[in-house]
Amino acid sequence: MNAPALSPARRTKKLPPLRVGIGGPVGSGKTTLLEMLCKAMRERYDLVAITNDIYTKEDQRLLTVAGALPEERIMGVETGGCPHTAIREDASINLEAVDRMLSRFPDADIVFIESGGDNLAATFSPELSDLTIYVIDVAGGEKIPRKGGPGITKSDLLVINKTDLAPLVGANLDVMASDTKKMRGERPYVMTNLKALDGVADVVAFIEKKGLLTV
């Protein structure tokens, strides 16, 4: 995990851009995670980001205001319908957005794609995403991991966010961790408090390792 990262130029010549899909229910912390990842990785990698909302471009605006990346490197997509359709059954609107961003920034190392808020059944099309990160939050209760669904059981990385709220909602983090291991087997997970940056480095390390960004 501590190996030096490839420079953007070296990776661009060797491999196509890594596409990282970030999904999860409304309010779980997807946009916050994307913001923190951009801020943590933008000095080492050439990044672009695509956000999905049903009728607005609110997440694009939030990332721009937060200074996650320069405005021109963040594209908002209005899906106009069910969020999971735009990332799975008919991902054409997002595939087109990826192509447009890469035509503007052909040296990009990573394309982040944030889905609109959806249920536990949402997954990314393999045509759209090389790695998938699924975000749930403690505020939903400690039962969430054992509810299952493809996002929890099949994502490359599960992020359990808002650990600081556990005492307030009566959630037992040890129970959540145990249930997560039962549901995911050997697939990794990270517990985070993104507002305090807790766990962000672990997510970055996962992306670098699984995305072949380290040597």
UniProtKB/Swiss-Prot annotation:
The keyword Zinc does not apply. One of its GO terms (molecular function) is GTP binding. Its main location: cytoplasm. GTP binds at G24, P25, V26, G27, S28, G29, K30, T31. GO terms for biological process: urea catabolic process. Pfam families: cobW. InterPro entries: CobW/HypB/UreG_nucleotide-bd, P-loop_NTPase, UreG. Gene3D superfamilies: P-loop containing nucleotide triphosphate hydrolases. It is found in: Cytoplasm. Keywords: Chaperone, Cytoplasm, GTP-binding, Nickel insertion, Nucleotide-binding. GO terms for cellular component: cytoplasm. CDD domains: UreG (cd05540). SUPFAM superfamilies: P-loop containing nucleoside triphosphate hydrolases (SSF52540). Facilitates the functional incorporation of the urease nickel metallocenter. This process requires GTP hydrolysis, probably effectuated by UreG. NCBIfam families: ureG (TIGR00101). Homodimer. UreD, UreF and UreG form a complex that acts as a GTP-hydrolysis-dependent molecular chaperone, activating the urease apoprotein by helping to assemble the nickel containing metallocenter of UreC. The UreE protein probably delivers the nickel. Belongs to the SIMIBI class G3E GTPase family. UreG subfamily. This is Urease accessory protein UreG. The lineage of its organism: Bacteria, Pseudomonadati, Pseudomonadota, Betaproteobacteria, Burkholderiales.
